[in-house]
Amino acid sequence: MNSAEALAFDVIVIGGGHAGCEAASAAARAGARTALVTHRFDTIGVMSCNPAIGGLGKGHLVREIDALDGLMGRVADRAGIQFRLLNRRKGPAVRGPRTQADRKLYRLAMQQIITEQENLTVVEGGAADLVCDGERISGVTLADGRVLKCGAVVLTTGTFLNGLIHIGEKRFQAGRMGEKPALGLSKRLLSFGFTLGRLKTGTPPRLDGRTIDWQSLDMQSADEEPVPFSLMTDRITTPQIECGITRTTPETHDIIRANLHRSAMYSGSIEGIGPRYCPSVEDKIVKFGDRDGHQIFLEPEGLDDDTVYPNGISTSLPEDVQLEILKTIPGLEKAVLLQPGYAIEYDFIDPRELKRSLETRKVCGLFLAGQINGTTGYEEAGAQGLLAGLNAARRAAGSEPVILQRTEAYIGVMVDDLTSRGVSEPYRMFTSRAEFRLSLRADNADQRLTPLADEVGILSEERRKRYLTRETALSHARMVTQSLSITPNLAGYYDLRLNQDGVRRSAYDLLSYPDINLDRLIAIWPELASIDPVTREALEIEAQYAVYMERQQSDIAVMEREERLLIPSGLDFDAISGLSNELKQKLKQRKPETIAEAQRVDGMTPAAVALLIAQIRKFGGRQKLAAETLEGKGAA
C-alpha cells in the first residue's frame, strides 16, 4: 500500500470516547475501511466523569447497543465491579441494569476490542479541519498537516469542542482535565452554516479512599447474582465491591450559600446550560434549600485504585471551598482531595440540523454523535455513535441509511427527540420518553434489534449463533406452554384461582396472572421443569405483557403508517393555503421527511397536519400528471 492509499479511508471517526468507539466499530463491522482519529491511543475508552454504565433508561440503551453487536455492554461486563438492577420491584419495562466500573479495566477492555477489530486503524493526532468537495465531505486535515481522505466523517468531539474548564474564578481551555480542547473545528462548522450553542456539564472532586472513614458510613452491596448487559457474557467474574453512602449537612449548605458568588455557575462566568437531572451541589442547595441533606454515593473507581468518586457533589466552586465542604460531610472530614471538581463548557450543534440517520442536512457525508448533538451520558453517546458509524459506512458505500423508529428502540426515541425537537438543556434518556415502553424493554432488546443487525451486516457469527440458540429455546418453551391447558375447576385443585367460566386456559395464559409463575405451573405439568432459568425469565415476562402488547400494537400500527407517509423533497410549504407563516418557516427550516416527523414540529396542530397531507396528495397528483405528459411526448 503506497502512502496515498494508506491515508485513504471509507469512514473517518474523530474522537475515541464512547460515541467514537461505537461509531468506529460499527463502520468497520459494516465493511468500511475505517480510521479512528484520537489524540492518544491510551485515552480510548476513558470514562471522563462517573465510573458507571447503565441505569434507568440508560440501561435500555446499553442493551440495545449490545443487541446491535456494539461494544459497551461487553466492556461493562468485563469491568463492572458493582452490578445492581434498579427498579427491581417494579415491572420489567422500567427496570434499569447498572454497574459501577473499574475505570482502568473499562479502558483496557475497550482498547483491546478496538485493536482487534478488522478494517479499523487508529490514527494518533488531532483533527484540525474538515475537507469538503462542494457540499460533500471528502477528508480530514490533522494538526500535523496530514490529510486523510474519506467518503464520510463521524464527528464525536464530546466536551472537547471549544472546551473551557471552570474551577471557581479560574478558567482554562481543555477538553477534560489534563487534555487539550479541539479549537479549529468549531470555526469550520460555523462556516458550513451550522447553528452552534454552548452547554455545560460538571464533575465532583476525586478523593483518596484511604482517608475516608468507611466505618462510620452505611454501605451498599452489589446484587448477589449480577445480571450481565451482554448476550455474549455467560456470567460476571470480576470481584464485586461495596460503595459508601453519606449526606451533606446544614453546615455544608451554609458554606455553599456563603460562597455562591465564587461559583462559576452563579458568578456569571458560565453561559452554557447544564443537565437538569445531574445538578451541581450549588444548584441543589439553591433550588432545594429546605432539605437538611442530600445523599452522596462514594464510588471506588477501581479494584486496585484508591480514588473515590463522590457521586452527588458535582461543583464549580473554588478548590479551597471544596476542601471546607468535605470537612462538613460525615466520613469525609479528613478526606484528601486528589482532583478538584469542575464545570466544563463546550460547543454543540442544534440537533435539528440532522437527519434521523445522524447525517447533517447541510454537508453530505458528515455525521455527528454524542455530546456535540446536545446529549449527556456515556450510554446516549454510545448509542448515537453506533447508528452514526453504521450510516456513515452505508453512505460511503452508496447504500440507504438505517433509520430506527420510535416504535422499535429507545435509540429511535432519542434520535427522533433530538432531530425533531432539539434541546434546550443536555438530553438524557428516561423510560418515560418512550410511548411504547412496554414493548421496548431491556430484556427483549435482542429480539427487537439483532435481526436488523444481521440484515445490515454488522452481526458477528458468534453472536448470531447465541441469539438463534436463545430464540429457539424461547420459541420451544412458548409452544409447549401454549399447548398445555387446564379448566378452571382443575386449576382450583392446584390452588390457582381463576374465573369459573368454563374456559380452558393455556399454561402460557396463566403466566400473565400476577400471582402465577412457572414454579407453580411445574406442580401441574412437571415437564416444564426442563426450561432453563434464562428462558424461564424471558417467557414469564413475555407472557406477563402479552395482553398489553396486543392493545399497544394498534397504536404502533398508526405511528408506522405515519412514518411511511413521506413528504416529497420538492414540496413547497409556502404553497399550503391556511398554514400559518410561522409553521411554514419552521417546516422549511426543519425539512421533515415524514408526516410523523412533521407532527413533532412545535406548533403543528391536527388541522395543520391535514393541510400538509392534502398538499402532499396534490403534489403527488401533479408529479404523476407530469410523468404521464413526458411519457406521452416520448411516445409521440
UniProtKB/Swiss-Prot annotation:
PROSITE patterns named in the record: GIDA_1 (PS01280), GIDA_2 (PS01281)
Compartment(s) of residence: Cytoplasm
Subcellular location, principal: cytoplasm
Gene Ontology MF terms: flavin adenine dinucleotide binding
Presence of the UniProt keyword NAD in the record: yes
Keyword terms: Cytoplasm, FAD, Flavoprotein, NAD, tRNA processing
Gene Ontology cellular-component terms listed: cytosol
Signal peptide: none
Top-rank lineage group of the source organism: Bacteria
Subunit structure: Homodimer. Heterotetramer of two MnmE and two MnmG subunits.
Protein name: tRNA uridine 5-carboxymethylaminomethyl modification enzyme MnmG
Gene label: mnmG
